[in-house]
């Protein structure tokens, strides 16, 4: 039977990872290693200056752990190299995140980092996020569409193989709409996220300052000379966005220009 490792950055008890396990439990043998507490926006942080403690969850056949103060990267690293080192995983899936991971979000994202760590460890990996924008807070959060999408993707991978070669992963964002409103899937490049320089300064009872960094609305800028819809455009039109991400951050287009610039500096 196929074996899938799940992680997230919202924490072991988050609704998203429970929905993810529920969606896949009949398709594969599921293992879960997730942070004990929320680790949103921790990026690729890995713990090397403190010990990590793994708590085995009772009643889960030894396949569930939560990592005290662990990050998503810690969880995947520890799962593959120690906790389940006897298991050959077919997939690592990180999510379902509560909120988008598009554009530059992918640099900050702990959810994407979990999938990146799986890729680094040589396992095909997917990050999946559920958009929350414009959701009526009086309406219960539904993962129905996200569950359908991940089931379809995983089945396609099991049938036809993982579509990417080398150190690459899939980043999936699911619009906040019903199955009836859903328009289909788009293969997209990342868009350009527009961040506001928002900092909220407060004063505590001891008259000392503290700060909250602002949460930003989903605003983006069109990519130049790009005919494809970006991930933001797809979501805005009730499409699922599927974006291939590459771990290699080298700007190859700039190598020759940089060589010329550097030669000039040495004269």
UniProtKB/Swiss-Prot annotation:
A divalent metal cation binds at residues 9-10, 40, 97. It catalyses: a ribonucleoside 5'-phosphate + H2O = a ribonucleoside + phosphate. Binds 1 divalent metal cation per subunit. GO terms for molecular function: 3'-nucleotidase activity; 5'-nucleotidase activity; exopolyphosphatase activity; metal ion binding; nucleotide binding. SUPFAM superfamilies: SurE-like. Its EC number is 3.1.3.5. GO terms for cellular component: cytoplasm. It is found in: Cytoplasm. Keywords: Cytoplasm, Hydrolase, Metal-binding, Nucleotide-binding. It is an enzyme of class 3 (hydrolase). Its cofactor is a divalent metal cation. Belongs to the SurE nucleotidase family. Nucleotidase that shows phosphatase activity on nucleoside 5'-monophosphates. This is 5'-nucleotidase SurE. The gene is surE.
